[in-house]
Design a protein with these regions (language model features):
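Anion-binding alpha/beta catalytic cores of soluble intermediary-metabolism enzymes, centered on
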Residues: 1-193
Length: 193
């Protein structure tokens, strides 16, 4: 990923800096969910995670969605306790300090984030409905999640959409299908990212 960003910087004279984020769109059962960061930040800090959430929220707004961000973890709102889970919770606190204009909460498991029946067990959760943006704790967990969903099928994966750089850049891997390339071309035409 760092190599790809370096090449993009070389070709476009863009300055990706700390703001670059990879957002991947997942289409399944009539729902659109964005997953981030799928490309850039290997081990993001809580401030990085807040930046990732903000960039992903911008992509969601660009797609006509009202952003609802879940900071994902293996724990829910402090239980069980771990260093990585605390980092996800602190990212939510960073957004509190920034006063952003979209919904967010966490840390929470993916089932709590996406399933309203499970979310009901956490009445203090600030999301008004299922999350449409999942911020993952690290790039590897985001990548594993996407590859798993792709291999199991019944999910259309679009991305990663590189956002936070000076130019529109869309990336396709060497194993991209014709549909993958078409989806990215549509995203480019709609100036998403």
């Amino acid at each position: 990923s760092a190599h790809v960003l370096k090449l993009i910087n070389h070709v476009f004279d863009a300055e990706p800096g700390d703001g670059a984020v990879g957002v991947t769109a997942l289409l399944a059962r009539g729902r659109l969910v964005l997953l981030a960061d799928t490309l850039v930040q290997e081990w993001p800090t809580e401030n990085d995670l807040a930046d990732i959430a903000t960039r992903a929220a911008d992509v969601a707004k660009n797609l006509g969605l009202e952003p609802r961000v879940a900071f994902c973890s293996f724990s829910n709102f402090g239980y069980p306790v771990s260093e990585r889970a605390i980092k996800m919770s602190r990212a939510s606190a960073v957004l509190d300090e920034r006063g952003v204009d979209f919904e967010y909460d966490g840390e929470m498991t993916v089932d709590v984030a996406l399933n309203p029946e499970v979310m009901k067990h956490y009445p203090f959760c600030r999301l008004t409905g299922p999350a449409n943006i999942l911020v993952m704790p690290a790039r590897h967990s985001a990548s594993i999640s996407i590859k798993l969903l792709q291999e199991l099928g019944h999910v259309t994966v679009i991305g990663p959409i590189l956002t936070g750089i000076d130019r529109q850049v869309k990336l396709c891997s060497t194993n991209s299908s014709v549909n993958d390339i078409l989806h990215m071309a549509i995203m480019a035409a709609c100036k998403v990212g």
